[in-house]
Amino acid sequence: MQIDHGRRSRPIDLIEIERSVAAGHGWQEVLGLVLVRLNADSGTIHLLGDDGALHLKAASAGIPQVVLDTVRVVAVGKGMAGLAVERKQPVNACNIQTDTSGDVRPGARATGLQGSVVVPIMCGDDAIGALGVATRYERTFTVAEEELLIDIGRIIARG
C-alpha cells in the first residue's frame, strides 16, 4: 500500500492514530498502532518532563525489565531518544547490536533488537519527546518511514 506523505491528504493510518490520541485511549494503544503500521517488534514513547528529562510514557511488551529501568528517565543528549530530541532529527541504526556510531548506548544492546529508529516528537519548532521503534532483524528505516513517524509524533504532541 502506498502512503501519501503530502500535506493535502491524510493517510488512513494517521487518522486512526489521531482518533486514538483524541479519544484519550492512552500512549500504550497509540504505540501499538505505530508498531503495527511500521511492522516493528518494539517501541517506546518518551515525553519531556518539567525537570527537562525524557520520561517513559509507553513501552511495548518484551523489553527486559533492566532496560525499562534504565530508560524510564533519559537525559536529553543521551542514547538514541535523547539524541533525537537534542538534534531534533531522527536517529537511525541498522543494527544496534553492532553499531559503532556512538549514538547507541550499551544498555540498548540488552534488548536483543537490531534495526531501530527514534524520531523527535515535535510541537512546532520544539522537541518535546521521542518516539522509537525497533525490529528483531537488521533494518534501516527509510526516509518515508522516518517522515511518517515524525507526523505521528506531531499527533502525539497534540495529545
Give a label for each model feature.
Residues 19-57, 67-68, 78:
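Helix-loop-beta substructure at the N-terminus of cytosolic sensory domains
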Residues 123, 127, 141-159:
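Amphipathic alpha-helical "output/dimerization" segments
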Residues 51, 122-127, 136:
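Flexible loop/coil segments at beta-strand boundaries within sensory signal-transduction domains
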Residues 130-140:
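Short beta-strand-to-loop transition segments that serve as allosteric relay/switch motifs
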Residues 1-25, 36, 159:
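Signal-transmission linkers at sensory-effector interfaces
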Residues 63-67, 94-115, 135:
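Signal-transducing coupling segments at domain and membrane junctions
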Residues 48, 53-56, 65-99:
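Regulatory sensory and allosteric helical modules in signal-transduction proteins
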Residues 114-122:
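A short, aliphatic-rich beta-strand micro-motif
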